[in-house]
């Protein structure tokens, strides 16, 4: 009788180990992201640590709280962003991700806040440069530093977008009409 319980317990333990290993692995990042920096630090409860970002372009900040809970605040208008004054934030219990647009004025202020629920928080922040192409509503495309044209996306014009919407509507309408005809006949 103890054997089935032992097997069940081993299965539960094995699944917990697999989940733990997956959590500890680095998350996959897109190929378009180029790792620029890795910053590790420790912050006390209720305190801020400030960093300054000078890199141009679209930047991704991925911060993992290794112990405790560190939160992320970003601003292009103040060098010392806080929970009262910021443009972008991520305040999760775990991994915090903020995407800083290319149009933000440099230098960008980064504030890391140690949540009061923990005496101290350890964090690791990875700074990535996003090399993907941004699409603009007026048909302009801003391309990354790679100007070879190998991975450039073409911007849609308003006429193409209208034609695509019209095509989708016609497809839906014809499908509904076929369904009605099939039911009737």
From Swiss-Prot:
One of its GO terms (biological process) is apoptotic process. Keywords: Apoptosis, Glycoprotein, Secreted, Signal. Transmembrane segments: none annotated. GO terms for cellular component: extracellular region. It comes from the Eukaryota. Its main location: secreted. It is found in: Secreted. Residues 1-23 form the signal peptide. Glycans are attached at residue 47. InterPro entries: UPF0669 (IPR031420). Disulfide bonds: none annotated. May be involved in induction of apoptosis in CD4(+) T-cells, but not CD8(+) T-cells or hepatocytes. Belongs to the UPF0669 family. This is UPF0669 protein C6orf120 homolog.
């Amino acid at each position: 009788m103890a054997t089935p319980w032992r097997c069940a317990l081993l299965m539960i333990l094995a699944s917990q180990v697999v989940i733990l290993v997956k959590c500890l692995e680095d998350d996959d990042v897109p190929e378009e992201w180029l790792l620029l920096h890795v910053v590790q630090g420790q912050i006390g409860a209720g305190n801020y640590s400030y960093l300054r970002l000078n890199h141009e372009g679209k930047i991704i900040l991925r911060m993992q709280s290794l112990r405790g809970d560190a939160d992320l605040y970003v601003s292009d208008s103040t060098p010392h962003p806080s929970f009262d004054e910021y443009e972008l934030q991520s305040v999760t219990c775990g991994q915090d991700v903020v995407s800083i647009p290319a149009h933000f004025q440099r230098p960008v202020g980064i504030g890391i806040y140690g949540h009061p629920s923990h005496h101290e928080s350890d964090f690791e922040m990875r700074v990535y440069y996003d090399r993907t192409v941004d699409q603009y509503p007026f048909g302009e495309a801003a391309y990354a530093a790679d100007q070879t044209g190998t991975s450039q996306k073409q911007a849609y014009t308003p006429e193409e977008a209208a034609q695509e919407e019209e095509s989708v509507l016609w497809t839906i309408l014809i499908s509904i009409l076929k369904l009605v005809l099939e039911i009737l006949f």
